[in-house]
Amino acid sequence: MKWVVSFFSIFLLNFSESRTMHRNAYGIASILDSSQCSAEMNLVDLATIFFAQFVQEATYKEVSKMVKDILTVIEKSTGSEQPGGCLENQLPAFLEEICHEKEISEKYGLADCCSQREEERHNCFLAHKKAAPPSIPPFQVAEPVTSCKAYEENRDMFMNRYIYEIARRHPFLYAPTILSLAAHYGKIIPLCCKAENAVECFQTKTSLITKELRESSLLNQHICAVMRNFGPRTFRAITVTKLSQKFSKANFTEIQKLVLDVAHIHEECCRGNVLECLQDGEKIMSYICSQQDILSSKIADCCKLPILELGQCIIHAENDGKPEGLSPNLNRFLEERDFNQFSSREKDLFMARFTYEYSRRHTKLAVPVVLRVAKGYQELLEKCSQSENPLECQDKGEEELEKYIQESQALAKRSCGLFQKLGEYYLQNAFLVAYTKKAPQLTPPELMAFTRKMATAAATCCQLSEDRQLACGEGAADLIIGQLCIRHEETPINPGVGQCCSSSYANRRPCFSSLVVDETYIPSPFSADKFIFHKDLCQAQGVALQTMKQQFLINLVKQKPQITEEQLEAVIADFSGLLEKCCQGQEQEACFEEEGPKLISKTRAALGV
C-alpha cells in the first residue's frame, strides 16, 4: 500500500516558483524563471476541480455554470494576448464567483464566508471542506453500457463529469493527482468497452484507481495538516530530509533551492489554488528532469513519461544510493565553534546542513526518525555549549543519538513479533485495547477503523526485509497518527492526545507510544444494554463476527480503562465459553438470555464496575 511507504515522498509531486522571484532566509533564489510560461492548461477541468472541492454539495449543473462564468471573467481580465499558462493568481476571482452566486452560497452554508474579505474569506472556505461529507454517497462507476455510450457521445463532458465526482469526494486531493488519475481512467474506458467481460474489466481496473485516490487523498490532507499545524520551519526540515534522501548526490545549495520551491507549491496546493498547483508543478518536474546528472540516476525512465505521469513516477522512484567518499558518521560536525553564539538564522542553516548530511548517509531511515536525531543533536549542542569541555561533551552525546534509531528498531521488531505470533486480527485487537485506553472518547467505528489500518500496516511492513521494516512502519504510523490528530483538530479527544498532536512533529509517534490511559476519562454509568447477547453471535461469520467481538471488547475497556491484561484475558475466556455453550445448544436465544446476565454480573464484580 502506498500510504505505508513514508508519506513524505509525496513532497516530490510538485515544486514551484512564485509569481515573483522569491528567496529563502539564506538568500538562495528559486530555481525557476517566473517569466517562463507552462504549456496550455485545460482550464475547464481545473475550474471544475476548484468549485467541486470548495462547494462539495453543489450539483454538476451548478458547478458547470460557475465554471463557465469564471472562465468568462478570466478571459476579460487577462486579455486574449496572454497565454492560458501564464495566469496570475485568480484565487480571489474564483471565491468571488461562489459568493456572486448567492443562491449557491446560501444553499450550501457558505454565506458566512462570503461576508468576510480576502484571507479571512479564503480560510473560511477552507474550513468548510469535509473529507467525507455524509450527504455525498461513495462514487459508483456506472454500468458499462451506460458509461460506454456516454463516453462515445461526448468524451470531454464524460471526463469532466468524472473529474467533478472525484474532486467533490476528495476535497484535499491535489489537482495534478486528480488530472493524472482521470487520464488513467480515460485510457481504461475504451479498453473495457471493447472487452468481452466489460463488467469484470471495469471492476478490476477501476479498483486500482479507487485505491490510489483514497491513499493520495489521505497523503495530501496529511501534508496540509502538517504545514498548517507545525509551520514552515518544521516543513522545511521534513523536506530537506526527504529530498536529501531522494537526491543524495545533489549538493546542499541545490537541495535548498528545491526546498524553497517545495514549500511554495505545497502552500498553493493546500490553499486550493489549482492553477498554480498544476502550472508550477509542471515547471519543476521539467527542471528536475533537466538536472538528472546532478540529482539522481533513478529517474531516467520517469522523465520519458507524459508530464502528468511524471510526478507520480518520481515519487515512487528509489532513493539514489549513498554517494561514494562520504564519511560514515558526522562526529564533531560543529568542530570548535560555539553553537550558542550563532544567531537564530545561523542555527537554522547549520541544522539544515546537518539534516542534509545525515539524511544522505541514511537514505533508508524514516523521515520522523531523522528529525528526532536532528532534534536530539540540536539539544546536545545547546547543552554542550554550557559545559567546561564542549568537544568531550559532544563526543559522548553523539554516540547517544543512536538511541532514536534503536527505539524505532525495537518497536518495529516488537510489532512484527506480535504480528507473527497473533496474526492480523488478534494484533488489531491488541491495538484496540491500547487505543481505547489512550482515547476512550473515540466511537467504536473510529477505534476499529484506526486500529484496522495499524494492523494492515503491520501485515504489510512485516513482510519486508528487516532493513525496510523500520521506514515502512514509521511512515505508516505517522500517517495514521496524523489522521487521528486531524480528528482531534475537528473535535478534541482528550488532553493527552492533544499534547502529542501539537507539541512536536518529530516526536508524535513516540508520544503516542508512551500514552497509556487517559486519566481524565470518567466512564459513563454501567449500561447493561451494551452487553446484551443474542443468537446472531452464533450465526455471524467472518468479518461480521469479528466486528461483534471487537464491539464487546471496546465496550468492556471503555467501562474500565484501567483493566489489566490478566483481567481482560479472564473476561475473554468467559465470553468464549458463553459462545461455545450457547451456540452448541438448540435454544440459543434462551441460553443467551439466561447465561449472558450471569457473565456480566461476574465481570462487573471482578472489575468493580
Curated annotation (Swiss-Prot):
Its main location: secreted. Residues 19-210, 211-402, 403-601 form the Albumin domain. Keywords: Copper, Disulfide bond, Glycoprotein, Metal-binding, Nickel, Phosphoprotein, Repeat, Secreted, Signal, Sulfation. Sulfated. GO terms for cellular component: cytoplasm; extracellular space. GO terms for molecular function: metal ion binding. Glycans are attached at residue 251. Transmembrane segments: none annotated. This is Alpha-fetoprotein. Cu(2+) binds at residue 22. The keyword Nuclease does not apply. Belongs to the ALB/AFP/VDB family. SUPFAM superfamilies: Serum albumin-like. Plasma. Residues 1-18 form the signal peptide. It holds the Pfam family Serum_albumin. Dimeric and trimeric forms have been found in addition to the monomeric form. Disulfide bonds join 99-114, 113-124, 148-193, 192-201, 224-270, 269-277, 289-303, 302-313, 384-393, 416-462, 461-472, 485-501, 500-511, 538-583, 582-591. Binds copper, nickel, and fatty acids as well as, and bilirubin less well than, serum albumin. It is found in: Secreted. It comes from Canis lupus familiaris. The modification Phosphoserine is found at residues 115, 344. Gene3D superfamilies: 1.10.246.10.
